[in-house]
């Protein structure tokens, strides 16, 4: 053979080998793809869809939920019966084509199977999601229904256990319970007939009515307890207490107490009858009004009981207190009468004592007998309490006034004695002041001093005359004694001032001799001051004149003389 033919044969053999190898590789790859598709198919088929369907099926769906479930269940049946079988056929066909090296048709079958698996996978996911939604929705609805039924059953049990606490409202409560029961029946019927929207609305109403009735039944026992137990018990207590108080001779300003008892009982009956409408706000408001009327009766009784304690105590105290104040007044009258024989007293004391006597007489006439016969009175104790307290307050004021009058008159004799003592002292002081001035050997006595001296002397004489009367005007004595005290003190101060001015003027006049010869101002002031001193006896003006002149030539000289004088000044010896 020629080399060309050999090369051709070799080339053909190589091509066949290469083609075979390529075919083997493609076949293995397709086998791998087919195996993968088979595994995907098995994985999808192995999903627990059947279990989930059975689980939802066991919920006994009704209405729209049941219809939806049937549709999804049928879709799953179609998938398992048709889609999976068709996929299986295509996989088998792809295997045969691949084994016979019909790779193009095998690839087409593989792609077809893959597309079908994708669709099936999506459908299964939708089915499972729908089943889960149905399950959750049914569980939710079931829980809602269960919750509503539980509320109803608990309410029913609570009402049955506490039936005695609902009083006249029980028929209306039974009626409301039957209405709720009817609503639950409507819900079941609508739900079964495939009308879930209206069924849900009915269930909502049933639940709302159950909750509302539950809230009402929680509040009713307290209202009923007030009407059937608390109020009647309080009224019985009040009526029993009222009868007992009447037996103990209590009287009341309020004359309609029996009628008020009856009105309250009628209000209790009326509110109990109206309660069947379950208008709890109105019932509570009426209960509040009833309680207020009951409380007002308690307050009436408690007021009189408290008033009795106070009035009984005051009825015992008042006669003793009245006697004490009356005795004080008699003693005060006697004391004023005694003092009036010697003293002219202010009319205020006598008039005040007469006013006290009038107050005492009024209490004797109007209140004393009532207090002494306290146990036989037919007046409310609250009125007696006011009467006694008013009288005791009047007696307290009278006693306080008596003490004031007594304080005003008890020192009259002391005032006289003190005034006489002061008069003796002031007369002696007046003589000592006169002797003190005489010993000074002054050129003359200043007119202002003489005026003060004789005025003081006249005031002492006036006091002496008042004390010498047959009946002493004690107010005048007190006033004149005070005036004399001030006058003698002022005269003493004036005496010291006159003597000081005169003494210092003499000293300064003598001291001015050292300046007179060469200070014309000092000489002029000396002459003027000397005339004021010796002729006019105006020692103050004379001192001012000479001291001013000396200060101009020797500042501080006046203070030096004044300080020296004050250290050695002679005092009046009283």
Curated annotation (Swiss-Prot):
Tree of life domain: Bacteria
Topology, Cytoplasmic side: 27-574
Entry keyword set: Cell cycle, Cell division, Cell membrane, Coiled coil, Membrane, Septation, Transmembrane, Transmembrane helix
Extracellular side: 1-7
Compartments, as annotated in UniProt: Cell membrane
Membrane topology value: Single-pass membrane protein
InterPro entries, per database record: EzrA
Gene Ontology, cellular component aspect: plasma membrane; septin ring
UniProt KW Transmembrane keyword: yes
Segments traversing the membrane: 8-26
Coiled coil location: 102-141, 274-350, 459-520
Protein family (similarity comment): Belongs to the EzrA family.
Its biological purpose: Negative regulator of FtsZ ring formation; modulates the frequency and position of FtsZ ring formation. Inhibits FtsZ ring formation at polar sites. Interacts either with FtsZ or with one of its binding partners to promote depolymerization.
Family matches, as NCBIfam families: PRK04778.1-1 (NF003407), PRK04778.1-4 (NF003410)
Identification of the protein by name: Septation ring formation regulator EzrA
Organism: Streptococcus pyogenes serotype M1
């Amino acid at each position: 053979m020629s080399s060309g033919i050999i090369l051709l044969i070799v080339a053909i053999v190589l091509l066949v080998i290469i083609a075979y190898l390529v075919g083997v590789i493609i076949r293995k790859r397709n086998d791998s793809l087919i195996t993968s598709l088979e595994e995907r198919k098995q994985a999808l088929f192995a999903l627990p869809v059947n279990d989930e369907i059975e689980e939802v099926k066991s919920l006994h769906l009704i209405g729209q939920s049941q219809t939806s479930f049937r549709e999804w269940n049928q879709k799953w049946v179609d998938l398992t019966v048709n889609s999976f079988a068709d996929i299986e056929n295509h996989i088998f066909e792809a295997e045969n084509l691949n084994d016979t090296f019909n790779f193009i048709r095998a690839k087409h079958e593989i792609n077809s199977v893959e597309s079908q698996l994708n669709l099936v996978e999506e459908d299964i996911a939708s089915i499972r999601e729908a089943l889960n939604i149905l399950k959750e929705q049914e569980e939710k609805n079931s829980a809602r229904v269960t919750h509503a039924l539980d509320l109803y059953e608990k309410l029913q049990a609570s009402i049955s256990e506490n039936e005695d606490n609902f009083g006249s409202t029980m028929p209306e409560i039974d009626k409301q319970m039957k209405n709720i029961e009817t609503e639950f029946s409507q819900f079941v019927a609508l739900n079964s007939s495939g009308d879930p929207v209206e069924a849900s609305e009915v269930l909502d109403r049933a639940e709302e009515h159950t909750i509302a009735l539950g809230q009402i039944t929680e509040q009713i026992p307290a209202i009923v307890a007030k009407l059937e137990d608390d109020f009647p018990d309080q009224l019985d207590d009040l009526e029993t207490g009222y009868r007992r108080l009447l037996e103990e001779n209590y009287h009341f300003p309020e004359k309609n107490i029996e009628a008020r008892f009856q009105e309250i009982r009628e209000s209790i009956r009326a509110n109990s009858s109206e309660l069947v409408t379950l208008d709890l706000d109105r019932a509570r408001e009426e209960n509040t009004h009833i309680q207020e009327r009951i409380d007002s009766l308690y307050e009436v009784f408690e007021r009189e009981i408290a008033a009795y304690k106070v009035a009984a105590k005051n009825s015992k105290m008042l006669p003793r207190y009245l006697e004490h104040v009356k005795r004080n007044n008699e003693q005060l009258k006697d004391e004023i009468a005694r003092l009036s024989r010697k003293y002219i007293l202010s009319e205020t004391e006598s008039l005040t004592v007469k006013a006290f006597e009038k107050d005492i007489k009024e209490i004797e006439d109007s209140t004393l007998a009532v207090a002494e016969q306290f146990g036989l009175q037919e007046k409310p104790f609250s009125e007696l309490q006011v009467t006694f307290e008013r009288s005791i307050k009047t007696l307290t004021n009278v006693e306080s006034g008596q003490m004031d009058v007594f304080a005003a008159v008890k020192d009259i004799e002391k005032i006289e004695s003190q005034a006489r003592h002061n008069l003796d002292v002031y007369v002696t002081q007046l003589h000592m002041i006169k002797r003190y001035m005489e010993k000074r050997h002054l050129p003359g006595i200043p007119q202002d001093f003489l005026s003060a001296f004789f005025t003081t002397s006249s005031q002492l004489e006036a006091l002496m005359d008042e004390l010498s009367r047959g009946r002493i005007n004690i107010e005048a004595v007190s006033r004149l004694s005070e005036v004399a005290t001030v006058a003698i003190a002022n005269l003493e101060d004036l005496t010291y001032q006159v003597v000081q001015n005169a003494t210092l003027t003499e000293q300064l006049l003598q001291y001015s001799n050292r300046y007179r010869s060469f200070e014309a101002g000092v000489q002029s002031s000396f002459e003027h001051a000397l005339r004021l001193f010796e002729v006019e006896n105006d020692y103050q003006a004379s001192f001012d004149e000479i001291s001013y002149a000396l200060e101009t030539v020797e500042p501080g000289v006046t203070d030096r003389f004044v300080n020296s004088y004050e250290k050695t000044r002679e005092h009046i010896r009283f």
